[in-house]
Amino acid sequence: MTIHTEHPFLDPDADPVRRLRGRLGGAVTLWTSGGGDIGAERAGLTVSSVMVSGGEPGRVLALVDPDCSLRDVLEETGRGVVHLLRWHDRELAEVFAGQMPAPGGQFTTAEWEQTAFGPRLASATTWAEVEVESFEPVGWSDLVVARIVGLEVGEDGVPLEHRRGRYLRPSDAEGPA
């Protein structure tokens, strides 16, 4: 058996754009839509490629996988809920990112309140109800532009951040070695 000096599973020619995106990092959000009287199947996705644009009204912009079920449900309903996740929500973030199993489905892993905009995480202190304005293909993602029509900014707590493929607390600013 030989011991290698390089990482055996690491792509030696990692995509530099992907590496840049990983180093930018960002707050972790959970987008949900569908269910209840809306008529569409419920869907959700963990999203960290997000920004908020000020204005009247404010808008939320996010990059999502064009093939994910959330994208389809957002297009069908035109509405969604954007939750700002906290450190204690990291397992939920993994479930909605498709990285952790959820026997019974993603929405069995937490308590939800069904709204006209989609399922709202009962424990979320900060969330926005949004109406989708547009989808635009951008690289391998779709840019979702959504108008904020309802907003609750609650207790800050310890936010969940994502950097270089890992969830971090803001105090872990140096990130992984």
Describe each region flagged by the PLM.
Residues 2-177:
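Basic, polyanion-binding surface patches
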